[in-house]
Amino acid sequence: MPKKDNNIEFVALDSLEYEVFEFGKYLRSVRQAKGISIRQLAKDVNKTPTYLSDIENGHNKPPEKELLETIIQKLNLDDSPKVKATLFDLAAKERNDIPADVKDYIMSNQTLLRIIRTAKDRPNSEQIWSQIAKTI
């Protein structure tokens, strides 16, 4: 249950399920959960409130890596790796790209690329990836 403080509604960041979110809506939820106004965040990242509002409302694409990292820093998400990863994942999904926080690693790792290409054509590859994730 969200709590209120000075008429601002907060939700626990861990309770945000990103599967039901678009990037902008998720960003807005995180920003509001942190109690930061759109004007303050815009000032902190050197953008206009209108620009950020357009992102939150789905009128602009998610920001590129550098700006997204700045937003994450200004939202003080260092203690929320799941939320950070979700922001990168949703931004990448809407851009039809690889998440920016892992792109360089994936592209520089030939073994990983070979494994991904092999797995994508295999039946039950989701189960294989789940087992790999458990091992790691």
Where on the chain are the PLM-derived regions?
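A short, Lys/Arg-rich alpha-helix, primarily the initiator
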Residues: K4-A33, S125
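Helix-turn-helix DNA-binding elements, focusing on the entry/boundary residues of the two helices
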Residues: L27, I38, P49, E64, ...
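The alpha-helix within a helix-turn-helix
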Residues: R31, A42, I72
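Short alpha-helical DNA-recognition segment
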Residues: G35-D54
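Short, conserved catalytic or interaction motifs in soluble domains
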Residues: N57
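DNA major-groove recognition helix of helix-turn-helix/homeodomain DNA-binding modules
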Residues: K65-T86
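Short, charged recognition helix plus adjacent turn
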Residues: P81-R117
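C-terminal regulatory/oligomerization modules of transcriptional regulators
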Residues: M107-I136
